[in-house]
Amino acid sequence: MNAVIASYLTQQPKPPLLKGAGVRWTPLHFNAEAPTEPAGETVGFCLQKRRKDSFVNYFVVNINYIIYKGYFMDILKQLENEFSLKAWQVKNTVELIDAGNTIPFIARYRKEATGSLDDQLLRELNDRLAYLRSLEEQKKKIISSITEQEKMTDEIALAIENAKTLTELEDIYRPFRPKRKTRASVAKALGLDGLAEKIYAQEKGTPSPEILAQEYITDEVPTVEDALQGARDIIAEQVSDDSQGRKLIRYAVKNHGVISVCGADEDLGVYENYAEYSESIKTIADHRVLAINRGEKESKLKVSIDFDKTIAFDLLYNIHCKGNNACTNEVITAVQDAYTRLIFPSIEREIRNELTDNACASSIKVFGENTRQLLMQPPVKGNVTIGLDPGYRTGCKVAVISETGKVLDTGVIYPAPPHNKIDEAKKIIKNLVKKHNVKMFAIGNGTASHETEVFAAEVIKELDCGITYMVVSEAGASVYSASKTAAEEFPQFDVSLRSAVSIARRLQDPLAELVKIDPKAIGVGQYQHDMPQKELSAALDGVVEACVNSVGVDLNTASPQLLSRVAGINSSIAKNIVLYREENGEFTSRSELKKVAKLGPKAFEQCAGFLRVAESKNVFDNTAVHPESYAAAKELLKICNVSESDIKTGNISLLKSQVETLGTSALAKQLDIGEPTLIDIVSELSKPGRDPRDELPKPLLRSDIMGIEDLKAGMELKGTVRNVIDFGAFVDIGVHQDGLVHISQITNKFIKHPSEMLKVGDIVTVWVLSVDAEKKRISLTMKKPK
C-alpha cells in the first residue's frame, strides 16, 4: 500500500460509516493473512462486524472502504471445504503450484506434502484455484470502481465479499457499470429521475402520478404521458439492475423453466426427434443440450425457455411494490416491462449459456477420459508390422515397420475398386511378409477399409502362419502426415506413405505415436467441434501430459513430440535433447541431461524422474525413482542386503521380504524419507523399467472377417469399446460398423453415466439386439439373454 495513503489512514478518526450492535473499530496490523504488505505496520482501521461466529474485515480508504479480506487465506479455506481436504494439504499444494512445480511432479514426487493427491484431483484443484483468484481480482476491480464513484455502502461491500461466482459479482456491479445509451439514460438526461424516485417511493398521500408529472413538462417532454413513460423506463432499469430480484428470477426459471424446441426447417434430418420437444431445465441431459445447440446453429431448430411470467411478476412485486395507490400501478407497469424487456431475455441467455457451459464441461471430461484410455492402450510390442492405409483410386499405401518402429519398406497396392488388382497386391504383401517376417497387420478404418480388411483376411488365411490384424483408428493420421512434424521425421516419403507408417506405429505403441497429433483430432468424444477450443485443448493437453509421465519416456529413443510432453520440458528443450543425442550419441545417465542447452536445475528436477535411460550403469536411471532419492534407495538396498545387480536381474524377493519384516514406517524413519516415497521406491525396484500399460488387457486381434449382413439378433460377439458418450458406448465388433450399446443395455443396475462401467479399449462381450443394414445401425446389449 502506498506509504502516503498509509500515513493518511493512521491519522484518521474512526470513521462513522457503519454503526450498530456488534460493530467495533480496531487498528489493523498486516500479518500472514495479507502477505503482500509489510508485517506489523499499522495502515488503517479494521471494521469487525460480528456475523454469526465469524468476522468480516474492511480497510478504510478516504472514508470510502474496500474489502481486503486476507483473500489468499480465504481461498485456501474454500478449497479445503470444496475438496474435503485437510488445511495442510491445500496449503502445501498451493505453495508447490505457486513455486512453479508441474502437476505430474507434484503428484509423483511430493506425496508427503500433498497427502498423496492424484494427478486428476491436483488438476481440478489447480483449475479451481485459478478461478477463485480470478474472482478475487474481479472483486478488487469492482470495489475500486464503485469506490471511485463514491457509491460504496456496507450492504454492497458485504454482498461483494459474499459473492461466490462471477455471475453474482456481475449482478452486484450491474447498477454501477457504465451503460450504453438506454431508454432510462435518455429519460435521466431529460431530468425525469426525480419523478421516477417519487413514483417508486409510493408514499401515502403522494399526489397522483399525473399531477406529479406536471412539474416535469418541458419542450423535450411535451406531455404527461411522455414524462410518465420516462419515469417508468428509469424504474424498469432500476428493477432490472436489482441483484435480489435477478437472483430470485434466476432461481425460479432454473427450477421451474422449460426448454422448448420446434423445427425451423421442413427437412430436419438428424434433428427429427426435436421437432416438437420440451424438457425441464433442471433435468435436461448434457448431450441433448449440445444436440439442440447444434440444430439451432444449423438453422434447423428454434429454441427458447418457457416460464410462467405471472410467477416472475409476483416475485418482483413483493420487492418493489410497497403501497396500494396510483403510483403503485405505475410501478407495476414498470416491473412488468422490466421483466419482459430486460430481465427475462438476459436470464434466458444466461441460463442457456450456463447449460451450454455445463454440457461442454461434461463433454470435455468424457473426451478427456476417452483420450486417456486410448493413449494408455497396451502397446503390441516385439512384432514387425505392416501398416495399410486403405484407398480406392489412389490405392492402398503400405509401410513395413520394425519391432522398434523403424521403417523397413514401403509401397502401394491396388486391391480395391476401380483397379481390383487383387492377385498382384497379394503377391506384393506375401513377399513383404516373408522378407521381413511380418507378424501383424494394422489397417486404417477410413475409406476402403472394409475392402482392405477382406483382402488382408484372405492373405492371412492363404499364408496360414499365425498372422493377426487389427483395424486401427485413422483419426488424425491425415493431419499428422501433412504436418511439419511428419515432414521433418520422414522427408523422403510422400504424405500418403507417412499415414501408413503412423497407422502401423499406432498398433505398436499408441502413446508414442498419438502424442504427435493434436488430441482434438483423435476423435473420441461427442460434439468436440462445438466445445470451447481453449478449454478443450487445455484439458486434453493435461490428459496427454499425465499419460506420458505415468508411463515414462525412453530418453534415447523418444521423439521431440513425446519429450515435450514430459514434465518440465517444453518444445525448445525437447529439440535440444534430440540435438544433443545426435551430436554426442546416446545418453549414458540421467545426470547427463544437465549438459543439454536450456535445461536448468528446475527443469531437471521436474523431468528427471520421468525419463528412462535403459543403457545406464546406474540401475535407478531406468526406474521412476527420482535422483533426489538415489541416496535413500542405495541405503535401502544396503539395509536389505540386496545389490544393484540383483535389481537388474529381477532377483528382488529378498528386498520385498526385508521391507515387510522391518516395516515401512520404521524403514522410512531410518532412511529419513516419507512412507509414500519408500513404497514407490520399493515398487520401482521390484520392476525396473516397468510399463503400467503392460498390466492392462491386450487389444483384440483378428484373423478372419464378418460383414454387417452376417449379424443376427441374439448373436454373441467379442468387441472393443471405441467411444464412450453420455448415452452409451460404441463397440467395434469386427464388421466395419461400430454397434451402439445404449446406457440402458450396459447393466441391470442403475448407472448415471456409461463411464461408470466402461472405458475406451475395454474388451467386452455383447449380444446383437437388432441390425439395420440400410442405415448401418447396430444395436447391442451387454445384458446376457435369458
Predicted regions and their residues:
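Glycine-biased, low-complexity coil/linker segments
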Residues: 19-20, 32, 38
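Accessory alpha-helical DNA-binding modules that contact the DNA backbone or grooves
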Residues: 102-103, 118-185, 189-218, 550-695, ...
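Duplex nucleic acid-engaging cores and interfaces of nucleic-acid transaction enzymes
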Residues: 121-124, 131, 135-145, 149-387, ...
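Long, charge-rich intrinsically disordered scaffolds of nucleic-acid metabolism proteins
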Residues: 168, 470, 476, 481-551, ...
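Low-complexity, acidic/Ser/Thr- and charged residue-rich accessory regions of DNA metabolism proteins
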Residues: 212-216, 220-224, 277-278, 309, ...
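Long, charged amphipathic helices and adjacent flexible linkers at domain junctions
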Residues: 350-368, 521-552, 669-713
